[in-house]
């Protein structure tokens, strides 16, 4: 696709693997587009040259505090310019940034920080109290209010030798088993994936992309921040998605590209129509998942040229691509076709390739080094399970029809909720920590907003003399897990359906669904606190 970034009349050729370094790309863009805005927020903005200066300052500061190659820096921060600068500064030193989910608190937060083994944690003031509640973690904690101001640390930053396959980040994902796994991504993993987003959306210098996702979500980087960096475009960061304010943000910031996940775009679609819906600069979007029945009408109503889709995971982003190029006649619900730099195969449980139309686990091989992630951080058992027979096993069940691929299910019991993967095992473990709960089964039932998404339902069995109602259990879960773990539906039952080997038969619970005895958080006006 001609992967080159112009530096004057000299291209930084990204077809050359050694050029695929995030710090090198920033340096070139700072010279090519010094005055172009790179990151813009509601409070401030920063140009490419200013970002390079800020990254240099933070690199010196980190180096002076003992941060070196392969050290980890946890970031518990709101979306802001400093967040992006700290990641680039860490990578310039060969260090590794670890975004921490800002919804985490209590033991979830403690576990993430302990497992990440950071040398430093940088925290926004909004979250300092959560760290204080955890007690001593034997890690340096720095408030964003204490970051070095302009005029300090102006010496030249160190320039360690970097390699395009070096790990630059660890993204914690719930995985498919309920045990959190740290996905190690390299410079190349990010850049090749961001180039896919650039290619699909036709992004270029002068464009503005809007990021509505939290920065602990890999999609924020691969679809918005890094594509802007690769093209010299501008990325607008907002704190959160707002269905009511989205189109005004698009108009105010001149947004030409964006990404929405889960039910976000369905909320936009279901909002009452108004005159001038199509009067906006948005040209290209990535909306996942977008029902085929809505795609065309959505484009017409809002005046959008193209709605692309991609299928992947933190381990291998943009694995399948579905480009809305006006030429390809995509079958309904097709996930797309494989990216050029990977080989894929659908295998059964014995490792044998399945035939057309038969569900098999999606497995991946890279055609060049460092296309896939670098493995799971300090997790040999997860790596052994994921990499077998020369293939990376994704855990996704797909079927193939000709050259097109279609999603079937997850091999493990995972709940898809508003663009997130919620482990049923993890939710059950939280519920079972309540002294009144003896058994718990969490599962997803089809969402009314989007068929590909779930509403979370939890069925529990209580101690014989326990006095616990559903709302109290919901509050307990809210206090001990991320807010999005709080089920919409809770039902207290006398017993759970079990197999002869005492395994819970969740398919029977799904088939049973919501009953007259089910507590509905939405109907009761219960709202989880973030």
Predicted regions and their residues:
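Gly/Ser/Thr-rich phosphate-binding loop
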Residues: 230, 255-260, 269-329, 343, ...
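AMP-binding/adenylate-forming catalytic core of the ANL superfamily
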Residues: 104, 121, 312, 364-369, ...
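Conserved ATP/PPi-binding loop(s) of AMP-dependent carboxylate-activating enzymes
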Residues: 341, 352-385, 422, 517
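AMP-binding/adenylate-forming catalytic domain of the ANL superfamily
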Residues: 481-503, 524-530
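Conserved pre-ATP/AMP-binding loop-to-beta segment of ANL
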Residues: 154-172, 179, 202-208
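Conserved AMP-binding/adenylate-forming core of the ANL superfamily
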Residues: 18, 27, 35-80, 84-88, ...
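Conserved AMP-binding A3 loop
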Residues: 47-49, 168-192
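Conserved AMP-binding/adenylation subdomain of ANL enzymes
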Residues: 191-208, 216-257, 271, 339
